[in-house]
């Protein structure tokens, strides 16, 4: 509601649309991976629960701060995937295309949440501390989940 700049509003609308498409693609991908025997349903349920808890118990500024951090993490991973062809080397061609699309999609909107943050938190003394706390929160939740989910999928792939 605080965003009045037409260009930023347009970017936010594009971000929301892209995230909706992203969600649909994730559902199709997860379905295919689940059919291959991966424990996707349990992992997806856990992420959904965590996001709902964040919404329930965190102010909107913290939710936005966590979003900024998560978008930053995924953009870093996407940049690495796109820059180093060894990462997808030997992968199924269809899966490699999906992951490349996913990486491109992540890099397209990586700054939108931060741009909204700058508008929403402009001049507020707690802005930096809140953003830093969001980064810490996202870090201690996201990276252990990435490691756990990787481990679970490697185990299931035996």
Question: Which residues fall in each region the model found?
Answer:
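Non-heme di-metal
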Residues: 1-158
């Amino acid at each position: 509601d605080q965003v009045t700049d037409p260009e930023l509003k347009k970017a936010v609308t594009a971000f929301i649309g892209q995230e909706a498409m992203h969600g649909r693609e994730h559902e199709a991908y997860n379905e295919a991976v689940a059919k291959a025997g991966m424990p996707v349903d349990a992992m997806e349920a856990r992420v959904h629960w965590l996001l709902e808890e964040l919404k329930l118990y965190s102010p909107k500024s913290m939710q936005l701060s966590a979003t900024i951090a998560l978008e930053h993490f995924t953009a870093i991973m996407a940049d690495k995937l796109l820059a180093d062809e060894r990462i997808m080397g030997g992968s199924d061609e269809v899966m490699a295309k999906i992951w490349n699309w996913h990486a491109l999609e992540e890099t397209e909107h990586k700054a939108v949440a931060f741009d909204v943050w700058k508008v929403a938190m402009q001049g507020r003394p707690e802005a930096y501390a809140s953003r830093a706390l969001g980064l810490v929160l996202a870090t201690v939740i996201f990276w252990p989940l990435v490691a756990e989910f990787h481990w679970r999928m490697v185990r299931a792939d035996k």
